[in-house]
């Protein structure tokens, strides 16, 4: 722009040049020039447009060999911008054509200085080279290669010659026309020729070549547009007309061909092609007036346009009108082919070839016949394969392969047949052959991936990794599925280990691979719930429900999730969000189960509250149901009503002969009734294929155990225990693990049983994470008011076994005594106890030692230092010496106990005057709700020093030892307590009482009581009751004289007491506070003071016979008070204390106790309720 403006200004400057000093008139001319220059500045755009037009005229002149037009245009261009590289290049080409090589070289040098990187310079340099003999020779060689069909070599020669910059004009057209002969570069060549055409309008040779290339490439509209450009040129019009007509004259007769002729005639009005077109147009219009011909032509046109499916009716009409028209028959075959109707297509092509074997369309028909035969056989093979007719499918694929052995789909079909036959080797071979024939056959890639996936995920992954990117994309669903399977397997392993949070993270990754997956979301939510992340778990399922509100699968999964987290009512409500008409069988089954659960839940609440009859009535009101019938049978079985249970099971089997639950129930009844032979027969008859659930297998294992088949029971439990661990928490899996643990403990594997109880805690949803240490484990055994029966059972069973396996050491000190007469009944005693308890077999063994010190005070003496108390023989002859009466000794004992048996053997304190071996054995069991214990024993009477350890008569008298009374006998005790508000107990015992130098005696004692639980909670109980005791001793030997026993022994004793007891425990404390008020009546007969005359010296026997202990009766009130408290200091150490105050008539001493207990394994479970301090061995 600036150059153009200055040039105009220069035209108006003084003749002396720009540096000349203008005169007045010169100044005016200069100012005028400046004004004109400024005024012409906005016209720069027009000048540029004019410049372009002039350059186009230069190219037009070059193309038409109009050198005069070139000269005129260059003159004007050089006035506008003489330094424009394009202008210089055009002048360069002009001089070169004129043979002025020197002038051309000067311009080339100038162009090198002005624009050395420009295309104008590069193409000019190439043109200069071509003007040399060597350049012309190289150009001729390239042209010869192109003419003789060596296109690639020709292009290489051109590129070497042009160095990437072909000269402008005809050589550029020549070069790109040659490049267009290469199919891979045709599009590039056409684009370059179009660019040249855009800047070189009127170049007929270029436009001719470009139009032909566009038509050959199927770009007809663009080709006709170029011909329209040619038609504007008088020199190119004739050629354009000929090319145009050549493109339309052979079109099938149709409306489209008529329109094409009409469009042509609007462009051209003279010439041979125009005459021919007019005649052809007239003829086609006449033909199209015939409906049959129109249908034929329109059908053929549609087929040629690839829309044969729409032309079938028209072509059928044409064939019906002219049955010898082979072209119409062939076109109909093409139409069927395009519609995919291979069978009809084959028939039409065969017909066309038979009608016109020498038709110009023969090659096309034969090719299409081959293609359609091939794909027809492929379709038939696919259909046979889908119908699982593998032999027929194989025949079709083999026939297809014979038709065309170059296409891969017949080989692929053979691979699919081999796959269906599970012939993996053949399938792999065919699939690999398919890929060698066509690496892009994604079905073969998929077939191999699935084949390797069946063999191992690792092999499939390795195969996928070896694929190209495009092949891998074609089976990305399989790759995602493999990754999903891998993550699912890892998650399942973590779930089996109770690592719910880690499993949930893997499910998150699975959900990213398959967004919106119902069951992946379900498993993710379930694991989050188990990990304690309840809000997140619920949010996942809510989001799924929002995404798929009407999806039955979602509704079922959400209901299952809610049901699995003990939200049956919410689960049922969610199922009802979907219209029942859309419920599938899964939803129907779940809804029925949830509704049944609600009924059973109500019935169980009634039963648990003691209203079993009402519970049964509720169930019997429901529609007949196998589940309810089995529940009623189970209840009858539990209460021992085997006849009713058997009848219920028989009723179920009458409706469902193969019901395994009922069959197992009958096995259990036979076992309960002792009919082991029938039970074994029933157990053997169970259909193994139907015992699929782990709960059924659990019941089978228990039956095997009860029948004594320990090996079979072990096999069953070993099989189902890992399955139960792998399952999500459920009642079924928890029951399996609970019973497996009990079995392991019973068969001598207590430590393994404890580990299984840990798994049972997870399965019962007591904890989401398996406990890893004793403190955590035992803390989980603590009771919870919210627990159902199963959780309570798992906790208590685990606690019982753990404590049975623990080693305990207890040290206690008991101070006890009662007031009386110094020297024999004013008792003050200390007992220090040490007991070690350890596991042995299925019970606990213990070692016990008691250090006992008993002091009964001092005798009061007269002035002579003598005493005549009713002790020894002092009433016969005053005694002297041995005023202080005390004794110390140590006892030892060992024993063992389990749930049924208990025994011990030991000694009375060694060091006492009388030492004996003592002990006992007992057996406990249940008869329905009634518990009972039978016992046999030899126990000391420890209420006085005389009765327990014996005393020695004063040495001033006989010096005889006597006392040490032992009770030898047995008894039975009964109890009734179902855990409800009321309880009853009773005890009956009989003993032979004997001692060293003591008159023999015997006794019978009856004791019974009733209690009512005012508060009956897991950790707090308040009871009030009524107790009754009736005793009878044959003789009253309560005196302390020689031959007496020193123990309370009324001939009649009756008492009633009202005890009140408060027991409670907290996390680390446990206590019992209680007391009673009582009324008692007793009667004693008058008895000889010295019942054994052989112990009395002869001199005193007459006097002794005259002395008696007077009888009589008495009655009155008494009371007791008791306080006992225990504290857990650590998991291993416990301390406690107790106070027991007695104010009664039965020689019962009061106690003060302190103790400490050590647990080797540690215990963080429930505190004992009430606390269990040591009891002196003498009082067992």
Curated annotation (Swiss-Prot):
Start-end of the TPR repeats?
85-118, 135-168, 292-325, 326-359, 374-407, 408-441, 484-517, 626-659, 694-727, 734-767
Among the GO biological process terms of this entry, one is: cellulose biosynthetic process
PROSITE patterns listed in its UniProt record = TPR, TPR_REGION
**Which region is the signal sequence?**
1-45
- Superkingdom is Bacteria
InterPro entries the UniProt entry points to: BCSC_C (IPR008410), TPR-like_helical_dom_sf (IPR011990), TPR_rpt (IPR019734)
Keyword annotations of the record: Cellulose biosynthesis, Repeat, Signal, TPR repeat
Q: In which pathway does it act?
A: Glycan metabolism; bacterial cellulose biosynthesis
**What cellular component terms from Gene Ontology apply here?**
outer membrane
The entry assigns this protein to a family as follows: Belongs to the AcsC/BcsC family.
> What does the UniProt function comment say about this protein?
Required for maximal bacterial cellulose synthesis.
Official protein name in the record: Cellulose synthase operon protein C
Organism encoding this protein: Salmonella typhimurium (strain LT2 / SGSC1412 / ATCC 700720)
What phylogenetic lineage does the species belong to?
Answer: Bacteria, Pseudomonadati, Pseudomonadota, Gammaproteobacteria, Enterobacterales
This protein's gene is called bcsC
């Amino acid at each position: 722009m600036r150059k153009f403006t200055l040039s105009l200004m220069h035209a108006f400057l003084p003749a002396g040049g720009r540096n000349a000093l203008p005169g007045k008139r010169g100044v005016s001319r200069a100012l005028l020039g400046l004004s004109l220059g400024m005024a012409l500045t906005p016209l720069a755009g027009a000048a540029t447009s004019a410049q372009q037009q002039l350059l186009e005229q230069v190219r037009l002149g070059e193309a038409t060999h109009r050198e005069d037009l070139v000269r005129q245009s260059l003159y004007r261009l050089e006035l506008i911008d003489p330094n424009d590289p394009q202008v210089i290049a055009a002048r360069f080409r002009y001089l070169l054509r004129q043979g002025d090589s020197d002038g051309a070289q000067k311009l080339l040098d100038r162009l090198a200085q002005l624009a050395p990187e420009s295309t104008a310079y590069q193409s000019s340099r190439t043109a200069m080279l071509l003007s040399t003999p060597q350049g012309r020779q190289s150009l001729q060689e390239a042209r010869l290669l192109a003419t003789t069909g060596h296109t690639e070599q020709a292009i290489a020669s051109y590129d070497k010659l042009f160095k990437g910059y072909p000269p402008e004009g005809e050589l550029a057209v020549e070069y790109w026309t040659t490049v267009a002969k290469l199919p891979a570069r045709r599009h590039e060549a056409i684009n370059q020729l179009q660019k040249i055409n855009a800047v070189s309008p009127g170049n007929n040779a270029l436009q001719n070549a470009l139009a032909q290339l566009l038509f050959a490439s199927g770009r007809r509209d663009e080709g006709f547009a170029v011909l329209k450009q040619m038609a504007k040129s008088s020199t190119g019009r004739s050629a354009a007309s000929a090319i145009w007509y050549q493109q339309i004259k052979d079109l099938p007769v149709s409306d489209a061909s008529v329109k094409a002729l009409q469009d042509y005639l609007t462009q051209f009005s003279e010439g041979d092609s125009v005459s021919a077109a007019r005649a052809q147009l007239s003829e086609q219009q006449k033909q199209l007036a015939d409906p049959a011909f129109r249908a034929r032509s329109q059908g053929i046109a549609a087929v040629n346009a690839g829309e044969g499916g729409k032309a079938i009716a028209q072509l059928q009409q044409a064939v019906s009108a002219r049955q010898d028209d082979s072209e119409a028959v062939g076109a109909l075959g093409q139409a069927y082919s395009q519609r995919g109707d291979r069978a009809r297509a084959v028939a039409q092509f065969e017909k066309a070839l038979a009608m016109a074997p020498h038709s110009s369309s023969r090659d096309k028909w034969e090719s299409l016949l081959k293609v359609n035969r091939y794909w027809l056989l492929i379709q038939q093979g696919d259909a046979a394969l889908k119908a699982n007719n593998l032999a027929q499918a194989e025949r079709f694929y083999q026939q297809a392969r014979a038709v065309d052995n170059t296409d891969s789909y017949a080989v692929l079909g053979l691979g699919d047949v081999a796959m269906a036959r599970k012939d993996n080797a053949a399938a792999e071979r065919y699939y690999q052959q398919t890929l060698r024939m066509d690496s892009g056959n994604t079905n073969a890639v998929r077939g191999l991936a699935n084949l390797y996936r069946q063999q191992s995920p690792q092999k499939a992954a390795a195969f996928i990794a070896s694929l190209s990117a495009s092949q891998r994309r074609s089976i990305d669903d399989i790759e995602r599925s493999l990754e999903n399977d891998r993550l699912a397997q890892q998650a399942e392993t973590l779930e089996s280990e109770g690592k719910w949070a880690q499993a949930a993270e893997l499910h998150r990754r699975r959900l990213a691979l398959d967004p919106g997956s119902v069951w992946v979301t379900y498993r993710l939510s379930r694991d989050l719930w188990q990990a304690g992340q309840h809000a997140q778990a619920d949010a996942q399922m809510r989001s799924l429900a929002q995404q798929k509100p009407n999806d039955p699968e979602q509704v079922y999964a959400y209901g299952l999730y809610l049901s699995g987290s003990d939200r049956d009512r919410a689960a049922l409500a969610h199922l009802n969000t979907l219209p029942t008409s859309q419920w599938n069988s899964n939803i129907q089954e779940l809804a029925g189960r949830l509704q049944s659960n609600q009924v059973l839940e109500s019935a169980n609440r009634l039963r648990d509250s003691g209203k079993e009859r009402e519970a049964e009535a509720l169930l019997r009101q429901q529609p007949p149901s196998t589940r309810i019938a089995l529940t009623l049978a189970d209840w009858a079985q539990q209460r021992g009503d085997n006849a009713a249970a058997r009848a219920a099971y028989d009723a179920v089997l009458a409706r469902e002969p193969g019901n395994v639950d009922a069959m197992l129930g009958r096995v259990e009844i036979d076992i309960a009734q002792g009919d082991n032979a029938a039970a074994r027969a029933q157990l053997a008859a169970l259909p193994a294929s139907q015992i699929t659930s782990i709960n059924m297998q659990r019941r089978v294992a228990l039956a095997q155990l009860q029948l004594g088949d320990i090996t079979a029971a072990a096999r069953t439990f070993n099989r189902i225990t890992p399955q139960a661990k792998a399952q999500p928490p459920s009642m079924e899996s928890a029951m399996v693990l609970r019973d497996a643990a009990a079995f392991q403990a019973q068969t001598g594997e207590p430590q393994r049983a404890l580990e299984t109880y840990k798994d049972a805690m997870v399965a019962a949803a007591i904890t989401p994470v398996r406990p890893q240490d004793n403190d955590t484990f035992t803390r989980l055994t603590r009771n919870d008011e919210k627990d159902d029966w199963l959780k309570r059972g798992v906790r208590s069973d685990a606690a019982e076994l753990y404590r049975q396996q623990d080693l305990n050491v207890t040290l206690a000190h008991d101070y006890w005594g009662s007031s009386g007469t110094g020297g024999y009944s004013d008792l003050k005693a200390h007992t220090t106890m040490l007991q070690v308890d350890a596991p042995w077999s299925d019970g606990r063994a213990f070692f016990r030692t008691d250090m006992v010190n008993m002091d009964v005070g001092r005798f009061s003496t007269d002035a002579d230092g003598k005493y005549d108390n009713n002790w020894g023989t002092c009433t016969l002859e005053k005694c002297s010496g041995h005023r202080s009466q005390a004794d110390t000794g140590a006892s030892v004992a060992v024993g063992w106990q389990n749930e049924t048996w208990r025994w011990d053997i030991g000694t009375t304190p060694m060091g006492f005057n009388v030492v004996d071996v003592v002990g006992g054995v007992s057996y406990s069991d249940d008869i329905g709700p009634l518990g009972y214990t039978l016992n046999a024993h030899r126990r000391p009477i420890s209420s006085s020093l005389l009765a327990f350890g014996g005393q020695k008569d004063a040495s001033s008298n006989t010096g005889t030892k006597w006392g040490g009374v032992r009770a030898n006998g047995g008894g039975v005790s009964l109890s009734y307590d179902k855990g409800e508000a009321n309880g009853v107990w009773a005890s009956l015992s009989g003993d032979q009482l004997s001692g060293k130098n003591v008159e023999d005696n015997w006794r019978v004692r009856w004791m019974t009581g009733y209690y009512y639980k005012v508060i009956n909670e897991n950790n707090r109980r308040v009871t009030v009751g009524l107790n009754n005791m009736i005793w009878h001793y044959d003789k009253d030997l309560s005196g302390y004289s020689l031959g007496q026993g020193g123990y309370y022994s009324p001939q009649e004793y009756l008492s009633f007491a009202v005890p009140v007891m408060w027991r409670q425990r907290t996390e680390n404390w446990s206590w019992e506070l209680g007391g009673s008020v009582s009324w008692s009546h007793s009667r004693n007969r008058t008895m000889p003071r010295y019942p054994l005359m052989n112990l009395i010296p002869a001199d005193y026997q007459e006097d002794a016979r005259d002395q008696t202990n007077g009888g009589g009766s008495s009655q009155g009130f008494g009371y007791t008070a008791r306080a006992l408290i225990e504290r857990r200091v650590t998991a291993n150490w416990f301390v406690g204390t107790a106070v027991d105050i007695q104010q009664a008539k039965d020689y019962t001493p009061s106690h003060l106790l302190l103790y400490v207990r050590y647990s080797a394994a540690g215990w963080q479970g429930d505190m004992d309720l009430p606390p269990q301090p040591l009891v002196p061995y003498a009082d067992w």
